[in-house]
């Protein structure tokens, strides 16, 4: 057997040769549209069934979303209370990476909640959850159950600092996201002009 017909020849083989790529992509697009349409129909049936009152809740708990921005908004719907974040997330993601977007959105939401008259703790809490949701692509439970409490405590000199309490589900986010959650909280407190923690002897 010659060298050209050995392993090296197989390694250079292109499996797409002879395939009609345009036709396959069109078929894939039609298939995705079919999935979307039938998923929508299934959700309509499920909503109607839930309204009969035989289940614990009268609505389907898992909302559908097309992208990270939509997932974030729907995941945190109970915390956002009508505050819309999806469009802002999309704009920021078009210009920045996910980590930068998570920090910028966290600050923006916290500031927006303060402007709407919410207290500091609520503003920090919701901002942190939005930032963590963007960071974890809104597919983990961490933004919901990984943050158990946000508190404002006092330093020895009387100034306030932010204290974030995490729960077990934060582990699903992974070590990097856990560390960045602390950074996000710190960036929020800077945005809202809250003091930093002052360690003592």
Indicate residue ranges for each PLM-predicted region:
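Extended, Lys/Arg-rich, non-catalytic nucleic-acid recognition/anchoring regions
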Residues: 1-201
